[in-house]
């Protein structure tokens, strides 16, 4: 992995911060800036890392707090289980989540990316600290890049593999549950080769992500950054460079040279020389506060120059803010040359808190989440579906009666097993034969009972008769489902 300079190529020639002009990988070794925002992010990251690991073990209403059981097609969120038949509920849930993301982005920009996204949290507060601990700072890492593979780098990757294995198990716990994961871990891989293959593949993907692909996930794979052009407006919160305060840039050497030139000009030693000073002398061209030190560039984990304006690659991690504030403090200038602001405010225009999308998005979020809450409150503890039996629609019995075979599918939405009894609702001339009743159905599972409804030929009008099947359990649930029997025409 050959190292290249951390300073970016000119914007007109650069495709991605992680690519050189010839298309080869440009490895980023960002310098850590320990400022006030970094300390806040680090504290939040430690809480999130612990929370991400604990969530699969937490339970609510007797169910996992979050379990995305793809195999059984059941999604449990905050103690509520969504089944494949809950199409409307799932639609409301997803729409509500996306609208909440749109609202958050419109108001606070990409605060999720820089502060709470698992990719950023694990990369910047788990993998990079371990990398710095083993290989050293950004300069030492660049030296290792030039030297090629070394023992330190082998040790780092070995630690990365172990860490990726732990994260893979944590990740899989969200999809298979901690009980199933415990069985995988305590049994030999020979007994469950498919599960072992899933774990090994997930570990490899984790290692590939955090050990090799790294910041390119945010720039190439994640669509969120590309959506910011439509999710943000000129008044959204961003990490921005105050060009009005910082320009024109000038290094310490430029500033010293300008002072020397001015002194020489005033002394008459250099008639007609260009006068540039940092003060407010009449006729002088003053430098801005930016000393063009590049600290904001070498500390950026995605390799951009924030002074070029808002960019897709910026994840609002605030590292450039901490780096710039430290420089401003050293040169005796006020902090905030790079700060949280909006495009309008950075250009000297007044900011507006209330604007259409900031009003419309929360109203839509309240509407959708309110509809979801009402739907969940009125959702029955079981779902009953009556289907026609296989084969002919009806059968003529030797006694002259007509038999209809029905299949009653019962989905138990609760967490405990229930026993369901199937009956005919108030129809004296019909008879129900239900060999499978009461039907036991486990929590979160479904079962189908086959029943027969026997009726005399005289019960049918134009070959049809409407009935109602009543299904109830021992916990007090009861539901009547309409159904139309088929029979011979009179």
Q: Language-model segments: what does each one mean?
A:
Residues 455-490:
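Terminal connector regions
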Residues 410-414:
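Asparagine-centered strand-capping/turn motif at beta-strand->loop junctions
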Residues 370-394:
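Hydrophobic alpha-helical transmembrane segments in integral membrane proteins
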Residues 1-265, 272-273, 334-366:
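Membrane-embedded alpha-helical bundles of multi-pass integral membrane proteins
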Residues 105-120, 210-225, 247-250, 280-328:
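Cysteine-centered iron-sulfur cluster-binding motifs in ferredoxin-type domains/subunits
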Residues 426-432:
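Short, solvent-exposed loop/linker segments at beta-strand-coil boundaries, enriched for Pro/Gly
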Residues 432-458:
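Intrinsically disordered, low-complexity Pro/Gly/Ser/Thr-rich segments with frequent PxxP/GP/PP motifs
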């Amino acid at each position: 992995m050959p190292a290249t300079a951390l300073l970016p190529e000119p914007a007109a020639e650069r495709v991605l911060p992680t690519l050189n002009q010839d298309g080869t990988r440009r490895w980023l070794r960002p310098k850590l800036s320990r400022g006030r925002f970094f300390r806040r992010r680090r504290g939040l990251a430690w809480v999130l890392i612990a929370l991400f690991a604990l969530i699969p073990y937490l339970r609510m209403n007797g169910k996992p707090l979050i379990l995305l059981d793809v195999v059984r097609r059941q999604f449990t969120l905050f103690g509520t289980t969504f089944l494949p038949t809950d199409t409307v509920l799932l639609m409301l849930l997803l729409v509500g989540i996306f609208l909440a993301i749109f609202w958050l982005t419109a108001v606070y920009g990409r605060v999720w990316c820089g502060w709470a996204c698992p990719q950023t949290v694990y990369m910047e507060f788990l993998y990079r600290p371990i990398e710095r601990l083993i290989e050293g700072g950004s300069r030492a890492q660049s030296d290792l890049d030039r030297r090629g593979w070394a023992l330190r780098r082998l040790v780092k990757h070995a630690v990365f593999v172990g860490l990726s294995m732990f994260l893979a198990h944590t990740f899989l716990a969200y999809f298979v549950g901690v009980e199933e994961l415990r069985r995988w871990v305590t049994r030999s891989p020979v007994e469950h080769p498919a599960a072992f293959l899933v774990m090994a593949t997930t570990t490899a993907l984790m290692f590939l992500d955090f050990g090799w692909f790294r910041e390119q996930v945010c720039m190439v794979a994640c669509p969120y950054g590309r959506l910011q052009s439509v999710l943000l407006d000129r008044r959204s919160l961003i990490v921005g460079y105050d060009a009005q305060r910082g320009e024109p840039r000038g290094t310490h050497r430029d500033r010293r040279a300008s002072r020397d030139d001015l002194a020489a000009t005033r002394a008459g030693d250099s008639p007609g020389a260009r006068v540039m000073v940092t003060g407010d002398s009449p006729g002088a061209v003053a430098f801005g506060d930016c000393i063009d030190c590049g600290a904001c560039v070498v500390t950026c984990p995605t390799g951009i120059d924030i002074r070029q304006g808002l960019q897709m690659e910026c994840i609002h991690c605030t590292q450039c803010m901490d780096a710039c504030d430290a420089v401003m403090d050293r040169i005796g200038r006020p902090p905030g040359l790079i700060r949280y602001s909006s495009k309008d405010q950075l250009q000297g225009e007044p900011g507006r808190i209330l604007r259409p999308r900031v009003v419309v998005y929360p109203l839509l979020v309240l509407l959708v989440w309110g509809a979801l809450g009402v739907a969940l409150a009125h959702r029955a503890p079981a779902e009953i579906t009556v289907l026609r039996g296989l084969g002919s629609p009806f059968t003529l019995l030797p006694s002259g009666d007509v038999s209809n075979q029905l299949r009653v599918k019962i989905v138990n939405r609760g967490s405990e097993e229930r026993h369901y009894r199937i009956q005919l609702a108030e129809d004296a001339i019909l008879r129900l034969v239900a060999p499978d009743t009461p039907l036991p159905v486990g929590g979160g599972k479904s079962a189908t009972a086959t029943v027969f409804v026997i009726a005399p030929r005289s019960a049918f009008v134009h070959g049809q008769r409407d009935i109602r099947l009543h299904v109830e359990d021992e916990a007090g649930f009861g539901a009547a489902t309409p159904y139309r029997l088929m029979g011979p025409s009179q």
